[in-house]
Amino acid sequence: MLQAIYNETKDLMQKSVQALNRDFSTLRSAKVSVNILDHIKVDYYGTPTALNQVGSVMSLDATTLQISPWEKNLLKEIERSIQEANIGVNPNNDGETIKLFFPPMTTEQRKLIAKDAKAMGEKAKVAVRNIRQDANNKVKKLEKDKEISEDESKKAQEQIQKITDEAIKKIDESVKNKEDAILKV
């Protein structure tokens, strides 16, 4: 019973950490990642479709991405979607592929993006604390319903706190690593 609560809590907290790392992949660091385009949708025959599902996206170097659509008639639509996404770059359409040349980031831009990373980390910590609160409430309900003793309840809450501390530590490490990657010149 308590083990199920621990397992569920650990699983939900791991998912929060994974979601944070997924969100981090959309932030730009010193080297441009293809993941920066993950949120862009292209109108594919009337259906909003992820950019990486209508063509291949690859990194040519630290500041250049290339998109090769599987259907050449999508070039204009992809170009329009990128412009509307407002990611700070103008698409360069050569009739075969679209190249995105990202300018080097200024120190000010790096600091702003690092600040965004920190805010994402704080959001993840709030999610983890909410998961802890839910788990503690389940334990307190078991105690109230006389299914576990007060001592078992206290031990269970301590165990939940340990799981929470581990998740918060992972979040802090992820934030620090991302900030370092962003601020690295």
Swiss-Prot record:
Belongs to the RRF family. It is found in: Cytoplasm. One of its GO terms (cellular component) is cytosol. CDD domains: RRF (cd00520). It comes from the Bacteria. This is Ribosome-recycling factor. SUPFAM superfamilies: Ribosome recycling factor, RRF. It comes from Helicobacter pylori (strain HPAG1). Responsible for the release of ribosomes from messenger RNA at the termination of protein biosynthesis. May increase the efficiency of translation by recycling ribosomes from one round of translation to another. Residues 138-158 are annotated as: Disordered.
